[in-house]
Structure formats: structure tokens, C-alpha cells
Amino acid sequence: MAAKEVVFGNDARVKMLAGVNILANAVKVTLGPKGRNVVLDKSFGSPLITKDGVSVAKEIELEDKFENMGAQMVKEVASKANDAAGDGTTTATVLAQAIVTEGLKAVAAGMNPMDLKRGIDKAVIAAVAELKALSQPCADSKAIAQVATISANSDESIGEIIATAMEKVGKEGVITVEEGQALENELDVVEGMQFDRGYLSPYFINKPETGSVELDHPFVLLVDKKISNIRELLPILEGLAKTGKPLLIVAEDVEGEALATLVVNNMRGIVKVAAVKAPGFGDRRKAMLQDVAILTGGTVIAEEIGLELEKATLEDLGTAKRVVITKDNTTIIDGNGEQAQIEARVSQIKQQIEESTSDYDKEKLQERMAKLAGGVAVIKVGAATEVEMKEKKARVEDALHATRAAVEEGVVPGGGVALVRVASKIAELEVLNEDQKHGVVIALRAMEAPLRQIATNAGEEASVVANTVKNGSGNFGYNAGNDTYGDMLEMGILDPTKVTRCALQFAASIAGLMITTEAMVAEIPQNSAPDMGGMGGMGGMGGMM
């Protein structure tokens, strides 16, 4: 085991603070509407230009082991805020730096670190309760657009496209962000349930101009096995021929004689039919077939639950208003399932999402829930260059997370105002001793830090702006975008409550640990052995006689 270096007391804290400051100073320049860019070097390709706090934090590794520990702990604050709320990473970093700086000064002055931490924790618990009281629901699409605009660094086009997407697919719907081909942002919305399986034979196509199959008011047959024998399908096909309605077959596979017979019947116009493979694999396929069954009001024909295809009747089939099948996708629009059953299925999937530990499973469950609840929207980000595209895509993703957080827990006045108002309400918090009281004061001072940083980045004097805002009341605050004061809600400057809450809680949690640090242990870097010297040249051969 390699030898370790141990640093104690004030020496340890000074090193740690140096690391905290290097990382936080690089991140905090991005805060607010007039935040600056940070350029990140990439080992290949062009550098990345970003205003996203967590992207900057993730790039930073310091040479000094002890300073690096401080930087990594603040990086953890940014990552945690990003994971929980998807935004607020820069705010969390600014708060953490403010608490650590003031806290370590107090420890150096001889105060008890544990009491300081208790004071900070009490202040944060009280602040979170006040934030919830200050919060307002974010229901209409105007508020959603404002939240998204603020999170996307005041880009209104991003705010509007996210608000439109949310309106179209609902709060449970899935919105994905992709790189587009054009210069402008585009929005594609798929209503109904879509899965990535196309027609099994091009002979099913009945709309040659679009190369797709369109079925109006079809029956939907769902089978959890391969169909290769046409005899199994005959009872259903005979019943269908009498109704004159089309049929969509969703099965593990349709092959051989069964597929050939379906194609011939379709081409002769005896029955209008199309077949597709069931989406997914294994257990996920069973679950997705059940989703389609609930959406269309049908039953999955599966031998493991005692249902045989030969004995299936028209009562076992689902129905929908319309089905569109392309080479790659099948979309079922307006399934005729019962709303109560669909809602029960959605809440069941929600429960599974909460219990799941795998990010991949969560994502797939989220997709299934969206397909049942509303639909899927794809935002295609447009830009002139690849560098701009990456930067813009990161901002759209941030804005999307912020919007979801706003819908979940509501909104508070933005621009750092919410924390300033909360701080003034909890200033008289009761504590046990003077050191704890100082801990509360540290937390209250830190809550002004985001507002001060926004003002600094906008080129204003932070103390003047902070005092003006503190002397105001309610939603009165500073709009750094156009350098004016006024009602933040009326000016459309909103922050999601969840983002502000998570930033404060994670910053205080990790800053509290750093204040109570008394020793740091790191490996002593090994000096690599010197290279071998070059070998001497070989003597020339003597002249030959």
C-alpha cells in the first residue's frame, strides 16, 4: 500500500478552501442572464462553449491532492442538484462556496464546528418550510414558458417550444431533445401510442404515396406468440369478413403460410389486414402488449393464461380510431380502452418508476407511461455550427428539467429574490447558544450570494443591488437582463421551487461536512524513476585488410 500524507486542522481547511474556490469561481461566472461563457478543452474536436454549471464542474481536476478533495466535494453539490432537479447547479455551487468560506472563518476564530453545523442545518430546515409557503403553482403554459426561458439563459424561443410541447403531450408525456438538421428549432409531436415496429410485408401498404398502411376504425388482435399456421387465425378472419372492418395483428412474429395467406387476402380485398411484430423483448414485450390491450380495450391472447388463438372471438379484440404503420413505426391513435383502466395502469407504472433503481429501466417505464398518458414530443435543436448545437442542446435539456420541476412543486420569484425573502423571515430563529446563532447567520448570509453573483455578472455593484432588494418586499427584485427593479413574477422571472430547495439543501449538507473536517488523508505522489540513459554508440569496425 502506498504511503499517505495526512494534513490536520487549519492547514487541511485552508487547502480544501483553495480547491472549493477554484471550482466555484469557474462555475459561478455562468450565473444569471448576463452570465459569461466558459470554454472547455476537448481531447479531440473543437472546444465546448457552455453556460451550464455542472458541465464546467465535471471538467475540473486539480493537481494538488488536498485542493482537489475540496473541489470534488463541491462538484458533488452540483451533480446532486443536477440529478435531483436537473438544474440549479450554479446556484448550489455559489451557496456551497458562501457557506464554506464563512464557516471556515468562524472555525479559525475558535468557534465550535459542530454547533456551527447545527445552526446551518436549523436555518436550512426553516428556509425550506418558508420556500414551500412562498411557492405558487405553475399550471398555465405562460408560466411554463417563462420558467423554461429563464433556465435556457433567457432564450425565449426555447421557452415557447417547451411550453408548446408540454401542452401537446401533457405533464406525464415524454419530451426528448435531439440534434436537428435545420437552423431553427423544430417540434415533432406523436399523438397516441407509437412503437418502433413496422409492417411485416410491403404488400400491406394501402397508401403508396406515403409508403404507409392506414387502417380506419380497425380491430386490434394481440398475440404473445409466433403465428405460422393460418388455421389458428381462421375463426377471427371469418368473423371479421362479416363486419367489413380492418384488422391489425400485433404478435411476436407472423411468418410462413400465415403471413402469405394474410397478404393474398389483403391484395384480393377479402379482408383488410396488416401485421406487425410486438415491441420490446422478453418481459418488457409482455408488459407493452398489455399496455396496448388496455389502451385499445382488448385482451392479450397468451397460452400461459389459458387463452388460445383458435378459440378467440371478436370480443377479445381491441379497437382504435385509426392506425398508421410505416416501414419502422406503428402508431395507434385514440384507442377505445376504458379511461379508468388506463389511469390505473399509468399509476401502476409510476409506482414501478419510484421503486426502480436502474436509470435504463426508469427511462423505459417513463416512455411506456407517456405513450399511455398522452404522447411523445421530440424537440429538434437547430444551430449553425456543431459547437453552437452542443451548447444549445445542453440549455434545452436544462430548461426541460426546470420546467418539470416547476410543474411538480410550483415556482418562486427568480433572480435570487426567493432566498433573500426567506432569509429575512427566519432571521429570528431560536437556537441554543452563540455558536449555533452564528451558524444561522452564516446560512442567512449565504442565501444572498446568488443575488450578489447575478448582479456581479451583470457588471453591477453587488452590495448596492442586494441592499435595494432587501429593502423591498414581496416579489420585488432585480432584473439583470435589462438592469431594472420590479415585481419578478410580473416580469416573468421565475425559478422552480424544487430547484431552489435542492440547491440550498445539497449546498448546506456538503458545506456542513467540510466545516467539520479536521484531517485530510491523500496518497503521496510517486516520483517516476528516471529514464534509462541512451546506450553508447557502437565503435566503428576496424578497416578490413
UniProtKB/Swiss-Prot annotation:
InterPro entries: Chaperonin_Cpn60_CS, Cpn60/GroEL, Cpn60/GroEL/TCP-1, GroEL-like_apical_dom_sf, GROEL-like_equatorial_sf, TCP-1-like_intermed_sf. Signal peptide: none annotated. The keyword Chaperone applies. It comes from the Bacteria. Forms a cylinder of 14 subunits composed of two heptameric rings stacked back-to-back. Interacts with the co-chaperonin GroES. Together with its co-chaperonin GroES, plays an essential role in assisting protein folding. The GroEL-GroES system forms a nano-cage that allows encapsulation of the non-native substrate proteins and provides a physical environment optimized to promote and accelerate protein folding. This is Chaperonin GroEL.
